[in-house]
Swiss-Prot record:
Lanthionine-containing peptide that does probably not show antibacterial activity, since its analog [+7]Flvbeta.f does not show antibacterial activity against M.luteus. Also does not show antibiotic activity when tested with [Del2]Flvalpha.a, an analog of Flvalpha.a, which is encoded by the same operon than Flvbeta.f. The bactericidal activity of lantibiotics is based on depolarization of energized bacterial cytoplasmic membranes, initiated by the formation of aqueous transmembrane pores. It comes from Ruminococcus flavefaciens. Contains DL-beta-methyllanthionine, when coepressed in E.coli with the flavecin synthetase FlvM2. The keyword Secreted applies. It comes from the Bacteria. Its main location: secreted. Residues 1-27 form a propeptide. It is found in: Secreted. The modification 2,3-didehydrobutyrine is found at T31, T32. This is Lantipeptide Flvbeta.f. GO terms for cellular component: extracellular region. Keywords: Secreted, Thioether bond. There is a cross-link at T41-C47, T53-C56 (Beta-methyllanthionine (Thr-Cys)).
């Protein structure tokens, strides 16, 4: 019975962990992306040339 309880207890947690990890990584990546780009606009030399520079200025 203990093994079955462990399996029953671990499986949902693992699924939740995976969902949680995905959402956290996505949120952190998104926040980092939009948090760093505005900083980059203050340092145009860091901004890549051409299209990317235009995108930086738009932000």
């Amino acid at each position: 019975m203990e093994k079955m309880n462990n399996i029953a207890g671990i499986t949902p947690e693992n699924e939740l962990d995976e969902m949680f990890d995905d959402s956290v990584v996505g949120a952190v990546g998104y926040t980092t992306y939009w948090g760093i780009l505005p900083l980059v606009t203050k340092n145009p030399q860091i901004c890549p040339v051409s299209e990317n520079t235009v995108k930086c200025r738009l932000l």
